[in-house]
């Protein structure tokens, strides 16, 4: 049932985004073309899911997101998210069901997109905050490499503090980094300190990629992130 809803979402959401923003995608070939793909992203804007979904779709994959459960309560939006196979997450509840569903999706060879921070960053510079351990635990449990992905440019439109500029033509850049393979550390999955260190390492990678993208972003739009 997920495929028809995914096609509807792709037709409804992506064309307007394509027309409104000026997109640049880098290194999409680093997203696995088949088999399980665990994509970990920075989160500077509420528009990030559109940018990240766009990149994953352009790479030839159907993304499944871990999304806030509040979104599933919105009429039509919630039905579309559930119908497209997205995974609701109740932040701070300790419920392990979303991770179990993500594990099943990865085991079935799907592409799962996660935001290790768990929410949009509150840092004034727009860089990633500390990450939660779920992404690393997924990678260790399934022996799946983490594919880091970062975006820059959409936060000026809609960030944590609220909606911003809707000026058309704003560049939105998305870049994919080299995969992070944690398979050799599989046995450390029960070592919480080790998992926290690996999570900190993941966030360092996402931060470095974000800084690189930010520093190359057009200066004319320097207010964006």
List the predicted regions and their residue ranges.
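A transmembrane-helix-recognition feature enriched in membrane-embedded lipid enzymes
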Residues: 1-33, 51, 75-84
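A secondary-structure boundary/capping signal
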Residues: 27, 42, 67-68, 85, ...
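Short, flexible active-site-adjacent loop segments at beta-strand->alpha-helix junctions, enriched
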Residues: 29, 43-44, 69-71, 92, ...
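Short, basic, glycine/proline-bearing loop/turn elements
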Residues: 13, 83-89, 118-122
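Non-catalytic C-terminal accessory region of glycerolipid acyltransferases
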Residues: 4-5, 97-225
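A generic structural signal for well-ordered alpha-helical segments
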Residues: 16-18, 56-58, 80-81, 105, ...
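Short gly/ser/thr-rich secondary-structure transition/capping motifs
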Residues: 18-25, 96, 155-158
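Catalytic core of membrane glycerolipid acyltransferases/transacylases, capturing the structured
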Residues: 32-93
């Amino acid at each position: 049932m997920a495929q028809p809803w995914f096609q509807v979402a792709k037709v409804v959401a992506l064309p307007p985004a394509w027309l409104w923003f000026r997109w640049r995608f880098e290194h999409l070939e680093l997203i696995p073309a088949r088999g399980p793909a665990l994509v970990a992203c920075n989160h500077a804007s509420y528009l990030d899911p559109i940018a990240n979904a766009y990149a994953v779709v352009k790479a030839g994959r159907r993304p499944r997101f871990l999304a806030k459960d509040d979104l599933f309560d919105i009429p039509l939006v919630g039905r579309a998210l559930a119908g497209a196979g997205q995974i609701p997450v109740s932040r701070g509840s300790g419920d392990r069901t979303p991770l179990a569903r993500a594990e099943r999706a990865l085991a079935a060879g799907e592409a799962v997109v996660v935001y290790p921070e768990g929410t949009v960053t509150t840092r004034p510079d727009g860089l990633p905050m500390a990450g939660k351990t779920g992404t690393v635990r997924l990678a260790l449990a399934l022996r799946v490499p983490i594919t880091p992905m970062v975006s820059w440019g959409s936060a000026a439109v809609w960030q944590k503090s609220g909606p911003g500029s809707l000026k058309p033509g704003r560049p939105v850049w998305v870049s994919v980094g080299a995969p992070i393979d944690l398979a050799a550390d599989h046995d450390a999955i029960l070592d919480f300190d080790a998992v926290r260190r690996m999570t900190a390492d993941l966030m360092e990678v996402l931060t470095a990629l974000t800084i690189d993208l930010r520093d190359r972003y057009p200066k004319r739009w320097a207010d964006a992130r």
